[in-house]
C-alpha cells in the first residue's frame, strides 16, 4: 500500500481544525483516519487532534492482535475510545465545552477495506476509472435526501448542509457506522473532509484521480478546492492498493 496526504487551512478560516494520520505496515496492511473538528475557540482543533492521536495509539497497540473477522469490533471499539477521550476533555475544560469532531477511518487488509465513520467526512473508492462514495453522511441534509424531501443537488445548496447528526465527543457514547468493501490492486481509497467535497463534485474527484499521478493527486485536489472557493479546511488522504495479500477477514 502507498499513502499520500495533504491538509490546507483553506481561504476563509483562521486555523486548521482538520487532522489525519495513516500507517503502512510491512504485511501490506494499512490504515488511515481523517477528522474534521468543530467548536469555538480552539475546540475543533483540540477535538480532532485528540481523536486522531487516540486512534493512532489504539491501532499501534491493538492491531497486531486482531484476527480475521475481528476488524469490525476492533474499529468500533477504537471509535468508542476516541469518543470518550474527546468527551472527557470537552466536559472537564470549560473552554472546550461543546467541541467534537467527525471521523472516517479505513483499515485495508487482505483484499478488504473496513470503514468506520461518524459525521460527514467521507471515504471514496476509485476503481477501474470510476469513483464511488463508500460512506453515508451523518447530516441533516442527508436525512432529507434519504426521505425524498430534497434532491442531492438541493442538498449541496441547503443552508443547513453543515449540520451533522453524529460526531465524536458530543455525548458520552456513540454509534459509528461500519461497512466493508472488496478492493483490488490499482484501487485508491480516499478519505477527505467536506472542505474538499463541498467545493469539488464527485465526478471531478474521479477524473483528477484518473489523470493525476498518485503522489501528486492530493495537491491537485486541494488546489481545485481552493480555486472553488476554499471555504473550509481541506484534508485529503489517499491509500493506494498495491497488493491484496496478507490477513483476510
Regions from the PLM with identified roles:
Residues 1-249:
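PP2C/PPM-type serine/threonine phosphatase catalytic domain
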Amino acid at each position: 500500500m502507498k499513502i499520500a496526504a495533504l491538509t490546507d487551512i483553506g481561504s476563509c478560516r483562521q486555523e486548521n481544525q482538520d487532522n489525519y494520520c495513516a500507517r503502512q505496515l510491512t504485511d501490506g496492511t494499512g490504515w488511515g483516519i481523517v477528522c474534521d473538528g468543530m467548536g469555538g475557540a480552539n475546540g475543533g482543533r483540540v477535538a480532532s487532534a485528540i481523536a486522531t492521536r487516540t486512534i493512532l495509539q489504539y491501532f499501534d497497540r491493538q492491531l497486531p492482535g486482531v484476527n480475521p473477522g475481528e476488524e469490525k469490533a476492533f474499529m468500533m471499539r477504537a471509535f468508542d475510545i476516541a469518543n470518550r477521550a474527546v468527551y472527557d476533555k470537552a466536559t472537564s475544560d470549560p473552554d472546550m465545552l461543546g467541541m467534537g469532531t467527525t471521523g472516517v477511518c479505513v483499515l485495508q487488509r487482505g483484499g478488504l477495506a473496513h470503514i468506520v465513520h461518524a459525521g460527514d467526512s467521507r471515504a471514496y473508492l476509485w476503481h477501474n476509472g470510476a469513483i464511488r462514495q463508500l460512506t453515508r453522511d451523518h447530516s441533516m441534509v442527508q436525512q432529507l435526501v434519504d426521505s425524498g424531501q430534497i434532491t442531492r443537488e438541493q442538498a449541496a445548496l441547503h443552508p443547513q448542509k453543515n449540520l451533522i447528526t453524529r460526531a465524536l465527543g458530543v455525548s458520552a457514547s456513540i454509534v459509528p457506522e461500519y461497512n466493508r468493501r472488496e478492493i483490488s490492486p490499482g484501487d485508491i481509497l480516499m478519505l477527505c473532509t467536506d472542505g474538499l467535497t463541498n467545493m469539488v463534485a464527485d465526478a471531478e474527484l474521479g477524473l483528477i484521480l484518473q489523470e493525476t499521478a498518485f503522489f501528486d493527486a492530493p495537491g491537485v485536489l486541494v488546489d481545485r478546492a481552493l480555486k472553488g472557493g476554499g471555504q473550509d479546511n481541506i484534508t485529503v488522504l489517499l491509500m493506494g492498493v498495491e497488493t491484496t495479500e496478507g490477513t483476510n477477514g
